[in-house]
Amino acid sequence: MAEVDLVTLADAGAFVSHEHQSHLAAVRMSDWRIDAAHSAFRFTDAEGVEHAIRAHFIGTSSPDDGTWLWGWDNINGFPPAFVKQSERIRALGERYAIPEFTHATLVLSDELPSTLMNAVKAVTGVTAHFSAPTGNGATRAWLLLDDPLLALPRPTVARAVAVVTSALAGTATVDHRGALTAWAEQRGARLTGAGEDVVELTLDDGSLQVRFDAAGRIAGLGKRLSGAPVASEPPKEQAAEPAAPERPEEQAAEPAAEAAEPPAPSPPERRGLLQRLLGR
């Protein structure tokens, strides 16, 4: 069986996670609340329309305690549907021997939540997340959000260039080739070889060639890169993080007290990148 570890999975989820969080940052969300009883994330959009979208509780980060706690441990007794994806992560961790997925608590570092969420997105196929204050010190709840309202636009050449360059500037991706391959798989783009150290992405409106340097890092993007100088360099400066959706920090991430309509039924469970790549 192919080797699988947390870093590999986090790299696999890095580009699509960066893309989806940038997309999510443009969605105006006010008066948000987490409705655990209905596995929903509720918010009001810029036009004053209220939405209830499917939410999956993944875990909590507690800087005060220095720990990450997986949602599958479910110390709060949340409904099974709300922690289903977290339990799926534990099952995959047991199946593929990924220890970070199978220990209820992990030692927290500044990078751990984003690393875990990138890996979670790779194995679940759900690629948008929301981080919410819980009202308990600096503890935050981490959720996957899954709804057509948040769907990404189709992948175009311009979008691929923007995603790759901004992701490289704003993430700590180790395996550029693996991250690009995973992004193409997740976004339905075709990836083929186009010469030594060059691959070609076939997208909705054309194709894009990507050159790798001797260390396997992305070194250039353009229409014709094989045997030619690098067309463009990923920016050296650090890209700014996408602005977080508006949310009142004082509001706790607790189930809504009032009765409310549940979100639309859950979509069919996605087959995550891990299973697709390993054929299981």
Task: Show the residue positions of the predicted features.
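Alpha-helical oligomerization segments
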Residues: V161-R280
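Short, ordered beta-strand-loop transition motifs
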Residues: W32-H38, T134-G137, T192-D197, A214
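Short acidic, glycine-rich loop/turn motifs
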Residues: D45-E47, A132-N136, L203-D205
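Beta-strand-connecting loop/turn residues
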Residues: A37-A40, G66, A97, H103-L106, ...
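Short, surface-exposed linear segments at secondary-structure transitions and domain or protein termini
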Residues: I58-W70, L92, A151-P155, G216-G222
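Surface-exposed beta-loop interaction hotspot
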Residues: N76-V174, G178
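N-terminal leader/presequence regions that precede the main folded/catalytic core
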Residues: M1-N76, P80-V83
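Short, surface-exposed beta-strand/loop "edge" segments at domain boundaries and coil↔beta transitions
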Residues: R42-R54, L152, G206-R211, G227-A231
